[in-house]
C-alpha cells in the first residue's frame, strides 16, 4: 500500500457573517494524497477547491477559520502549527507553484538570483553548489541555455518560460508535495500543453506528489492519477482519473464533461442551467438539487453521504448515481450529432491547395527569370459546414 503524504479528515472551514452567523464554505471534506500521486481538484469558481488546497499547506485565508477537522502532513496537523513551524515545512516539504508566474516573480531581480534565494532558504548548499544547482533546475524544466537564462529578468521571458522558472523555484527545496493552483492560466493552448507535459515528466522523474487545482477538466485529465470533483464546498465525486472520465457517475461531473467542446462532433456543447448555491444558503437536501435532471423529492429533503462504490473504486455523493452508469457510452449523444451530410451544408471547401512564394533575386527580377519556389502551404484540404 502506498504511503500517504497528506490526509484531510472531516475538514470544515467557514466565516462569521455580519449577523454573527457561522457560515461554512468547506463542509466535511476528507481525502488522502499518496506518495508519488498527482491529484486533480476540479470545480467551478466558488466550489472551495482553492480553499481546500491552501488548507493543505496550512494556510487559511484572512477572514476564514477552521470549524473542525484536520490536515495531517506526515501525521502532523498543519492547522495547529505555529508560523515558525510552518516556515520549516513550506518550500522545503510542501511547495506551491502560483497561478500567475509573471506576478509572482520579482521584476527587478534576475532569474538566477531568485532561484538562489529559494536554495538559500530551503537547503544547506554552499555558493558553488547552489550555482550548479541553479543550472540543473533550469535544465530540468527544459529552459534553453541555463547559464544565460539565469542572468535574465522576468520581463525578458515569455509566459511559458516564466511558469517554468516558477516550477524550478518550487523544486529547489526537493519538496514531498507540490501544490499547483491553476498554473496554466493565461497561457496559450500550445504553451499550456508544454507546461502540462513538463509537469507529467517532473512527477515521474522526481516522485513528488502533486495537487493540481483547476476549473479545466481537460487539463486535469492530462496530468492526474486521481480526480476530486468539488461542488458548493463538498466533494461530490472522487476516484481514479480514467474511471471518472469514462464513467462520471455524478450528474455534476457528467455535466462538466458534456460541456467540453469536441472537434469530432458537430453542434454546441451543453451547458448546465443555474449556478452554485451561495455559502450558507443550503439548509437541507442535495446542494446540486436545483440543477439536476435526476433529482427527486428525496434529493430535496435529504443530503446524500459520500458513498464508496467498490467495483469502480470511486466515492460519489448522489442517491441516483446508478441511473448514470448506463448513460456513459457517448456523453454528447443527447446534445449533438455527427454531421453526415457535410456536402449539403458546406459553405467553404479547399481541396489540394498549395501556396508558394518565389525566392527572387534582384537580377532575376530585371531579367524576368523564374526563381526557385519556396512552398509555405501544401496540399491543404478543408471543409467548413454550417450547423
Residues of each region from the PLM?
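A short, proline-enriched helix->beta-strand linker immediately N-terminal to the Walker B motif
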Residues: 172-176
Amino acid at each position: 500500500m502506498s504511503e500517504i503524504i497528506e490526509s484531510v479528515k472531516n475538514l470544515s472551514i467557514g466565516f462569521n457573517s455580519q449577523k454573527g452567523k457561522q457560515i461554512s464554505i468547506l463542509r466535511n471534506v476528507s481525502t488522502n494524497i499518496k506518495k508519488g500521486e498527482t491529484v486533480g481538484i476540479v470545480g467551478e469558481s466558488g466550489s472551495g477547491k482553492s480553499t481546500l488546497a491552501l488548507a493543505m499547506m496550512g494556510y487559511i485565508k484572512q477572514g476564514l477559520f477552521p470549524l473542525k477537522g484536520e490536515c495531517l502532513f506526515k501525521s502532523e496537523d498543519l492547522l495547529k502549527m505555529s508560523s515558525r513551524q510552518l516556515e520549516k515545512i513550506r518550500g522545503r516539504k510542501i511547495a506551491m507553484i502560483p497561478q500567475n508566474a509573471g506576478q509572482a516573480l520579482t521584476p527587478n531581480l534576475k532569474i538566477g538570483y531568485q532561484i538562489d534565494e529559494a536554495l538559500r532558504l530551503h537547503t544547506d548548499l554552499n555558493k558553488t553548489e547552489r550555482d550548479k544547482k541553479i543550472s540543473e533546475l533550469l535544465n530540468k524544466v527544459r529552459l534553453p541555455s541555463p547559464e544565460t537564462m539565469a542572468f535574465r529578468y522576468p520581463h525578458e521571458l515569455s509566459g511559458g518560460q516564466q511558469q517554468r522558472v516558477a516550477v524550478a523555484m518550487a523544486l529547489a527545496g526537493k519538496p514531498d508535495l507540490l501544490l499547483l493552483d491553476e498554473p496554466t492560466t493565461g497561457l496559450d493552448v500550445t504553451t499550456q500543453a508544454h507546461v502540462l507535459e513538463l509537469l507529467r515528466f517532473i512527477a515521474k522523474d522526481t516522485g513528488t506528489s502533486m495537487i493540481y487545482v483547476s476549473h479545466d477538466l481537460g487539463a486535469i485529465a492530462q496530468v492526474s492519477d486521481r480526480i476530486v470533483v468539488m461542488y458548493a464546498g463538498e466533494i461530490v465525486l472522487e476516484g481514479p482519473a480514467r474511471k471518472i472520465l469514462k464513467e462520471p457517475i455524478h450528474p455534476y461531473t457528467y455535466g462538466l464533461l458534456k460541456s467540453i467542446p469536441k472537434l469530432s462532433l458537430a453542434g454546441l456543447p451543453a451547458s448546465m442551467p443555474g449556478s452554485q448555491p451561495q455559502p450558507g444558503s443550503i439548509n437541507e437536501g442535495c446542494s446540486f438539487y436545483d440543477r439536476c435532471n435526476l433529482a427527486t423529492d428525496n434529493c430535496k429533503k435529504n443530503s446524500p453521504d459520500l458513498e464508496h462504490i467498490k467495483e469502480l473504486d470511486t466515492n460519489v455523493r448522489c442517491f441516483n448515481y446508478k441511473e448514470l452508469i448506463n448513460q456513459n457510452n457517448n456523453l454528447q449523444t443527447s446534445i449533438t450529432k455527427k454531421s453526415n451530410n457535410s456536402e449539403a451544408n458546406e459553405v467553404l471547401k479547399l481541396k489540394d491547395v498549395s501556396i508558394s512564394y518565389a525566392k527572387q533575386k534582384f537580377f532575376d527580377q530585371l531579367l524576368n527569370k523564374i526563381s526557385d519556389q519556396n512552398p509555405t502551404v501544401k496540399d491543404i484540404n478543408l471543409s467548413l459546414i454550417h450547423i
